[in-house]
């Protein structure tokens, strides 16, 4: 049985865009580099040729990976979700109980998780601690530096 990959509609669109870029822009550019490098003669000592072939291999591998993830995608339109209980797709505002610092995280699938963009994987320790909780609740998360406590200040669906 094929395992579905949960993702937001935004995450699906981002993967689709990357796939199109790799297929229609990167692939032809790499093929052109290979042809140009091949024209320089002896391939056994042609570093430019080997680098282009390696880039082609990497690109084709990523294309296959993207096609697989898109084929198995279980797209969830977060804007149609609601409720006070935190689940996949929720955007959660947390207050660190030690520092009073506010942070905002959206709980997404592993494929689209990116901490720099405020998106955490549903399988992360923080997301696992948040799932099923409501605004006003305090959660404790085991972090590399020890346990951290956060108050759930807001739950949004956007």
UniProtKB/Swiss-Prot annotation:
Matching Gene3D superfamilies: Transcription elongation factor, GreA/GreB, C-terminal domain, Transcription elongation factor, GreA/GreB, N-terminal domain
InterPro entries reported for this sequence: GreA/GreB_C_sf, TF_GreA/GreB_CS, Tscrpt_elong_fac_GreA, Tscrpt_elong_fac_GreA/B, Tscrpt_elong_fac_GreA/B_C, Tscrpt_elong_fac_GreA/B_fam, Tscrpt_elong_fac_GreA/B_N, Tscrpt_elong_fac_GreA/B_N_sf
Keywords annotated in UniProt: Coiled coil, DNA-binding, Transcription, Transcription regulation
Family the entry assigns: Belongs to the GreA/GreB family.
One MF term in the entry's GO annotations: DNA binding
SUPFAM superfamilies per UniProt: FKBP-like, GreA transcript cleavage protein, N-terminal domain
Protein's UniProt keywords contain Coiled coil: yes
The protein, known as: Transcription elongation factor GreA
Superkingdom to which the source organism belongs: Bacteria
Translocase recorded as keyword: no
GO biological process: DNA-templated transcription elongation; regulation of DNA-templated transcription elongation
Gene responsible for this protein: greA
Transmembrane segments: none
Organism the protein comes from: Bradyrhizobium sp. (strain BTAi1 / ATCC BAA-1182)
HAMAP family: GreA_GreB
Chain segments annotated as coiled-coil in the UniProt record: 47-74
Role summary: Necessary for efficient RNA polymerase transcription elongation past template-encoded arresting sites. The arresting sites in DNA have the property of trapping a certain fraction of elongating RNA polymerases that pass through, resulting in locked ternary complexes. Cleavage of the nascent transcript by cleavage factors such as GreA or GreB allows the resumption of elongation from the new 3'terminus. GreA releases sequences of 2 to 3 nucleotides.
């Amino acid at each position: 049985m094929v395992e579905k990959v949960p993702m937001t509609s935004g995450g699906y669109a981002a993967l689709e865009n990357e796939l199109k870029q790799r297929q229609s822009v990167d692939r032809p550019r790499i093929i052109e580099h290979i042809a140009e490098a091949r024209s320089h003669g002896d391939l056994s000592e042609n570093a430019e040729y080997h680098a282009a072939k390696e880039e082609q291999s990497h690109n084709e591998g990523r294309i296959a990976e993207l096609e697989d993830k898109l084929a198995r995608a279980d797209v969830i339109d977060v804007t149609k979700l609601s409720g006070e209980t935190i689940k996949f797709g929720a955007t959660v505002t947390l207050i660190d109980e030690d520092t009073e610092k506010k942070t905002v995280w959206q709980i997404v699938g592993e494929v689209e998780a990116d901490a720099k963009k405020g998106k955490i994987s549903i399988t992360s320790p923080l997301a696992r601690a948040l799932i099923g909780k409501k605004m006003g609740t305090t959660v404790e998360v085991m972090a590399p530096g020890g346990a951290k406590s956060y108050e759930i200040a807001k739950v949004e669906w956007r």
